[in-house]
Amino acid sequence: MKLLEERIRKDGEVLDGNVLKINSFLNHQVDPQLMMEVGKEFKRLFENEKITKVLTCEASGIAPGIMAAYQLGVPMVFARKKKPSTLNDAVYWADVFSYTKKVNNKICVEKKFLSSDDHLLIIDDFLAHGEAVKGMLNIADQANATVAGVGVVVAKEFQGGSEWVKDHGYSLEALARISDFENNQVHFVGEE
């Protein structure tokens, strides 16, 4: 998605440890117009999949997730990183390691929001090692839901997550595919 790649070039910052900081439009401050375009692109890519729900993970998956769900005309469910007191004990749990924050999280979704009738589109902000996506796939599996596809805003192709998702038989669409951060510059797949 050219618009997204241009925005990453303009406002993204490569940090130590192969981290891309895009907090001016996605991971802290959110650009709703850009996220609407992200949602439209996910709709275009997955509209033939009979999606019943979008599943994402808090917090940075919510903006692209809600826009994709809005465009597809379906609800969005987000996995929580902490179980609030209002959540009952009927939940699906999965362990997720965050490479950015260097912490283990337990994510959860209340069981009443996912079922074997669901055809899920999993959406996330980044796909690097694939830990968040693996956790959401685990939750979908616990619910006996069908995963129609995985959509990510940014895939860091050199960190193995994309390969893992595809090797496990899931349809994957990434709106911006990064090949490397050579010389602290973002290089997209397919560039010379």
Swiss-Prot record:
Gene3D superfamilies tied to this protein: 3.40.50.2020
Q: Which InterPro entries match?
A: PRibTrfase_dom, PRTase-like, Pur/Pyrimidine_PRTase, Xanthine_PRibTrfase
The cross-references to Pfam families, in alphabetical order and at most eight, read: Pribosyltran
Q: Which GO terms describe its molecular function?
A: xanthine phosphoribosyltransferase activity
Residues given in the record as 5-phospho-alpha-D-ribose 1-diphosphate binding sites? A128, H129, G130, E131, A132
Highest taxon above the source species:
Bacteria
* Positions annotated to bind xanthine: L20, N27, K156
Is the Nucleotide-binding keyword given for this protein? no
Q: Its Gene Ontology biological processes?
A: purine ribonucleoside salvage; xanthine metabolic process; XMP salvage
Report the EC code(s) recorded for this entry.
2.4.2.22
Q: Give the UniProt entry's GO cellular component terms.
A: cytoplasm
Q: Per the record, what are the reactions this protein catalyses?
A: XMP + diphosphate = xanthine + 5-phospho-alpha-D-ribose 1-diphosphate
Q: Which family does it belong to?
A: Belongs to the purine/pyrimidine phosphoribosyltransferase family. Xpt subfamily.
Q: What does this protein do?
A: Converts the preformed base xanthine, a product of nucleic acid breakdown, to xanthosine 5'-monophosphate (XMP), so it can be reused for RNA or DNA synthesis.
Task: Please describe the quaternary structure of this protein.
Answer: Homodimer.
Descriptive protein name: Xanthine phosphoribosyltransferase
- Recorded source organism is Lactobacillus johnsonii (strain CNCM I-12250 / La1 / NCC 533)
Q: Which gene encodes it?
A: xpt
